[in-house]
């Protein structure tokens, strides 16, 4: 993997944060997220995507998951402290 590709992969979490913030309260599928990252030049596997979403949740983003045949993610905002 080239240095540029490696850097872009590391940026995936930043791009995901931007995407969730721009689509607040809207259902977002795994394919939506992978397509957006692809548009940004970032190519990751689904497993890596799931781990990135978990990291964003730890960061404090309230991302709800609706499981089913096609999982949907809903960003509700930042979690409140307290």
PLM region descriptions:
Residues 1-82:
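Short, basic/aromatic recognition patches that contact phosphate-bearing ligands
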């Amino acid at each position: 993997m080239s240095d540029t590709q490696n850097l872009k992969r590391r940026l995936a979490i930043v791009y995901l944060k931007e995407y969730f913030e721009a689509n607040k309260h809207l259902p977002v599928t795994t394919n939506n997220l992978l397509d957006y990252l692809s548009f940004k030049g970032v190519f990751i596997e689904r497993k890596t995507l799931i781990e990135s979403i978990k990291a964003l949740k730890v960061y404090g983003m309230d991302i709800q998951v609706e499981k089913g045949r096609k999982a949907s993610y809903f960003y509700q905002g930042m979690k409140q402290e307290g």
